[in-house]
Amino acid sequence: VENAELKILSKAKKEKGNIPNKKVKSGLPNISILGTGGTIASFVDYKTGAVSPAITAEQLVNSVSALDEIANVEAEPLFSLASEDMEPEHWEGMAKKSKEIHDKKGHGIVVGHGTDTMAYSAAALSFQLPEVSNPIVFTGAQRSPDRPSSDAHLNLVGAAKVAMTDLGEVAIAMHETTNDENVAIWRGTRVRKAHSSKRDAFVSPNEGPLGIVSENVEMNSKYRSITDETKLESGFENNIALVWSHPALKVEDWESMTSSKKGVVIAGTGLGHIKSNLLDAIGDTAKDVPVAITTQCLGGSTNLNVYRNGRELIGKGAVEAYDMLPETALVKMMWLSKHRADKVSELMGENLVGEISNSRKLD
């Protein structure tokens, strides 16, 4: 009918749905799943094509029926954020909540998290919780749970299995390969997201995974076991700089990025290199605040004794962080500056929670 007028009589309301109360099954272990947002808790809006947070921790847990077969699962909503919006205060919140769950419930913990900054958060919890009475396992998804190709279900079930072991440290559990077969377990301080979209996006330079999850969890590397009590030292000094060495870096750039900072991490090229004309400026900075040097490379380690510039950096007060990933080195210095302010330079080169590998040798 031409020129007909359409009137909206009412608008449909989006049903959230009631989450049924699950019966506790005797004989099954108990775990908690912390919801923090990310793709694993998102749906695709097919009108816009964009992915956005859309489901709660409870809905995520109830969407994966396989979890009911292996554990009694409690959902613990914490916040709902894209991982690029995570800040140090959120790291602190996750650590405190994990400590609370360990102390009050004795549960292993799975943290649902966006993958982009998952490695930062895993490192942050590793330093804040150096001893844990139950595992803390981060997991996420490269593709949202509503997509047929989603990796969310396998990752979540794999992480839950790890949360029921005697792993006494913070870890990440994500797809080992692009196939829906196994989940790899990565140490929280030795892991990087190395691919923007593939399922097997995570790697651990110089080490490889701590273990693999298939039907069972098989640990293939040395790991720390759970302790009687979870130890918490939460909080960070945020005023730390991370500077990447590159050919266009100038003295004025260095001064702009590091002035008023309480510490600096340099991601050097190769063995820990940075331009010769920056050495004096770095030395001036190192007189006042800690300066640590790691490498941008995903294999090998720093060695400042090989070339003249490296030896000069040591002489000017910089310290080596060896094969610590730059992002982990940043988090470590932020944590040390809050809790061990008088020993930052000394401790940056020491292996506290597995952040420095045992294979930092020159090939």
Question: What function would you assign to each model-found segment?
Answer:
Residues V1-A12, N21-K23, L271-D363:
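C-terminal non-catalytic interaction/assembly regions of soluble proteins
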Residues S10-E100, D280:
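ATP/NTP phosphate-donor binding region
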Residues L34, T56-A57, N62-L67, A184-H273, ...:
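Accessory alpha-helical/coil subdomains and C-terminal extensions
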Residues L34-T36, V111-H113, V137-G140, A171-E176, ...:
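Short beta-strand segments
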Residues G35-A41, H113-A119, T178, T269-H273, ...:
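Gly/Ser/Thr-rich loops at beta-strand to alpha-helix junctions
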Residues D103-M118, S259-L271:
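Short acidic, glycine-rich surface-loop motifs adjacent to enzyme active sites
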Residues V111-N134, I274-I282:
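Short Gly/Thr/Asp-enriched flexible loops that form oxyanion-binding sites at enzyme active sites
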Residues T139-S214:
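Internal gly/pro-rich beta-alpha loop/helix module
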